Regions:
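Conserved subregion of the PPM/PP2C metallophosphatase catalytic domain
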Residues: 1-23, 27-33, 37-207
Length: 207
């Protein structure tokens, strides 16, 4: 069980980027994760609307969900040519937009509950225009809920601080800065949850 992500090649050079977190651990959760991942890939290929894809996957998971598990998903579609990022949220953490000067903000959530819980749920989509140098962090709650020896969580505010102190110059640097910050905060405390983070960045040549 735990986190997963998929990189899906779509038409017109677009990329589908689902980031997800399954509710449980163990063998049943691992099977549920595999099923969720397969269904997401199939739904993504059939539509360019991330909300429609989540709605389709939710219905399929709910029909067969005898274990009463669920999966939170943030599904984004990025167009490198235009810099447009369209996303839909199923009970997941809000993506973080980081500007070239290091300022950052959480992008608005779109509503929509975790997948597999209930049928007939609508998943609205939202589009943001990335400018050159903009970076978007797609992550799971393993980052925000990472805990140190005093029982404090890393939290969203520390995510903002990571980039305020050192604006990312590329995707690799953004990812390393985030993981280093979490690692330094946690110290020797055992990791209790999966930690997953994807980076979408638009640079001067549209990638």
């Amino acid at each position: 069980g735990g986190d997963f992500f998929v990189l899906i090649r779509l038409d017109r050079g677009q990329v589908g980027l689902p980031v997800a977190d399954v509710s449980d651990k163990g063998v049943p959760a691992a099977l549920f994760m595999m099923s969720s991942r397969t269904l997401l890939k199939g739904a993504a290929i059939g539509t360019v609307d991330p909300g429609e894809a989540l709605q389709e996957v939710n219905e399929l998971l709910y029909e067969e969900n005898e274990t009463l598990m669920f999966v939170t998903v943030l599904y984004s579609i990025y167009n490198p040519e235009t810099g447009r990022l369209t996303y839909s949220n199923g009970g997941h953490d809000a993506p973080m937009l980081v500007r070239p000067d290091g300022s950052s903000e959480l992008l608005p959530l779109t509503g929509g509950v975790a997948l597999g819980i209930a049928p007939d749920i609508e998943y609205p989509s939202h589009t943001v225009q990335l400018e050159p140098g903009d970076t978007v962090m797609l992550y799971t709650d393993g980052i925000t809920e990472a805990m140190n020896g005093d029982g404090e969580q890393f939290g969203v505010e520390r995510m903002h601080e990571v980039f305020a102190e050192s604006p990312p110059e590329n995707s690799e640097q953004a990812l390393k800065a985030m993981f280093d910050a979490v690692r330094n905060f946690v110290g020797d405390t055992p990791q209790s949850d999966d930690i997953t983070c994807l980076v979408v960045r638009r640079d001067e040549v549209g990638s």
